[in-house]
Amino acid sequence: MQNQTFTAADIRARRAETPRPRDRDFAESLGISEAALVAAYCGKGVTRIDAHPDVVMEAAQDLGEVMALTRNASCVHEKVGVYDNYHPGNHAAMILTEDIDLRIFPSRWQHAFLVERDGDAATQCSLQVFDAAGDAVHKIFLRDGSDHKAFAQMTRTMASDNQSPEAQFADRAPVEAAKIAEDKIDILRKEWARLTDTHQFLRLVSKLKMNRLGAYRAAGLPLARQLSPDAVDALLINLQSSGTEVMLFVGNHGCIQIHTGALHTLKPMGPWQNVMDPGFNLHLRRDEVAEVWAVDKPTQRGTATSVEAFDARGALIFQVFGVPKEGRDSRPAFRAIVEDLQEVPA
């Protein structure tokens, strides 16, 4: 368990002294989890609720149009839309709408809170979910047109029995570095070539005692081509200028959020590359991109080409694919853009 050196009162006092940083940054500066910071305000604008996706998604569907946020250490993915079409599952669940498209892993949803905070102009309301270590898994932010009455009712009807501001969190598991089984590389290449669906890939590499990044390094050309980290900017710029539609995945071990469509407005700022489109924002720390791969996987509908970025620890930052939908197939255009991206210097 994490060493909780600060009481909830200590955390609130420190926060009052330093109100400007975002929750994640402030919690990191204090050496606590983000969920510990949120929990410290239970009874003071924060209500602890059941974190199971079945509960959270049922509530989310009553809120109307909201902003969905899923992030990892290097990338933030924000989509505006309505939660609907929820598909429950013990291992994996989904929200499938045109605007909000989520892959949910219920075992990671361990702590959840309804949060009300005074903002510059109005009270900001959100539903925030965290994993066992207190790291954010998924957040839902109400907008002006959201159903604020439904949210207020949730604070009364969904409140857990335990509303203590003190909470315990597990130690954060380290990121798994690239894992390669040298004696199984030939098997990897042969089995990879026989794939018929991209979802079979992780089962294959797990069976061979490897992981995603390890498999890319092991397989090499023509299945996986390492690109320069600078290729990420080139990719986004070319997608924006060409209007090519993509599926852009950003996630963590508890939730993956997907945007499908074109990228219209890029606004770089310092180390950040930002997509600032109506209904979709992306915030990417370019300086934390350490390794980039262009990957081909065979499927029944043709080759699925992706560009995938990793940080220095080996954690996946994002994936980009062409859109494979009938009548809206952008894969050839996407593949042409990827083929022109700069490879990593030899």
Give the predicted meaning of each segment.
Residues C75-V76, G134-H138, I256, G314-F318:
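Short loop/beta submotifs within extracellular cysteine-rich repeat domains
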Residues Q200-P271, V275-M276:
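Long, positively charged binding patches that form subdomain-scale interaction surfaces
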Residues M1-A122, A346:
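An N-terminus-focused feature that recognizes amino-terminal "leader" regions
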Residues A59-Q61, I100-F105, R117-C125, Q240, ...:
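Short, low-complexity cationic-aromatic patches
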